[in-house]
Amino acid sequence: MSFSSLLPPPEHSPPDDVNSREVEIITKEHDFIVNALTKKEAVHSSNNNIGSFVGSQVANFNDVIPLRQKDFYGVQAPLPTTQEIELCKVRTQEVVNRLLHKFTDKGKAGYQKDTRKITTGSRIITIESKRQDPLQPSRQKNTSSKIVLPEDDETDTPILHATDDAKSKRLTKEERAKWNIPAAVSSWKNPMGYTVGLKHRAAHGKKTGNVGSINNKVSDIVAALDETDQEIREGIQQENELKRKQLKEEERIKEEKLRAIAERSKIQTQSSAVKKRGSRFEGGRHQNKKIKKEEPPIKSAAERLKELAYAQGREVSEKVILGAAKATTTGTGANVHYDSRLFSKGANAAAKRSEEQVYDNPLFVQQEIDSIYRVNAKSIDEANSVSASRYGPIQFTKAHSLDDKSTAKDEEET
């Protein structure tokens, strides 16, 4: 017996005799298991299962024992058979298919023949409804929440009178003139934006019949308004003139103050300049005296050479400094050639620029480094021209020593 077998059948499933019998058998088995778990006597009783623990009025000691500690005499819940499992599977499959069939049903496909003129021949078009996802939300808007007001039937119906009817009374010209409103005086309509004075505004007494008459009080009011307007304008002009005069006076006072300040500053600068000149002369004299005292005495050339040699870490004799020392001659007084690089190395031996500097000069000059891999067109042209100017066989000459050269020179001189 499975858990799905205990569930009730689907709501919309048709009644079946086989299903009802199976349900009865399952319920009986369920009652038997419940009685066996709750009461010992139910195991030895017949399959009718008359009487239950709920209906009994007398309580036993076994009723107090917990279910986990009771001995059920080997009673086991029967497992469902393969036939029951298959029946449950078929029923659930039918219900699921019936629910999904509403959404996934294609509907009957419609066929329509194309009647257009086609050279290749006629064709048939199939029309099918698109499949919808059953889990997709509905696209229709919920219009039930909208409030629709009922139509108002009680509208104001206009009352129309027939003009041809004899009962209808027509208005005369006098009545129309009473209801007429002049365009200049109308407060409802003034599209051109005209302004009307009080004199002309008071002359619209068509209702009273006094068309051309103007009240004297109106003219008095107009005159009073004009007078007050003129007085106000004159007062404003006078106030503006007073303000202008005050501003001019303030500007004049400011200019005078600035001029006085400028004159004072000029006088102060002139007096300070005169004082500074005198102090400068006196200060310059004292400063020159201090400089002369602080300056070291003038040293001779010999003393300076001694100091220079001492700074370079060399010992130079006084004869060398004074130029009295003479170069020693070797042998018979022949000309001895010295390499000038020895002197430069000796002079720069103690004057190293840094501890990392091992050699006096770099390996290559910077210009030679830059032109290592650069082709020099001038040198190539010179080499070509020299090679082209050569002609004849190569002649070798015998090398001469220094002694041979000196004897040859002596012979030429003699």
UniProtKB/Swiss-Prot annotation:
Compositionally biased region (Polar residues): 135-146
Superkingdom of the organism of origin: Eukaryota
Compartment(s): Nucleus
Any single biological process term in GO: generation of catalytic spliceosome for second transesterification step
Keywords for the protein's UniProt record, in alphabetical order: mRNA processing, mRNA splicing, Nucleus, Spliceosome
Principal place of residence: nucleus
GO cellular component labels: post-mRNA release spliceosomal complex; Prp19 complex; U2-type catalytic step 1 spliceosome; U2-type catalytic step 2 spliceosome
Any matching Pfam family: SKIP_SNW
Region (Disordered): 128-159, 264-292
Purpose of the protein: Involved in pre-mRNA splicing.
Subunit structure: Associated with the spliceosome.
Entry's family note: Belongs to the SNW family.
PANTHER family: NUCLEAR PROTEIN SKIP-RELATED
Name of the protein described by the UniProt record: Pre-mRNA-processing protein 45
Species whose genome carries this gene: Candida glabrata (strain ATCC 2001 / BCRC 20586 / JCM 3761 / NBRC 0622 / NRRL Y-65 / CBS 138)
Name of encoding gene: PRP45
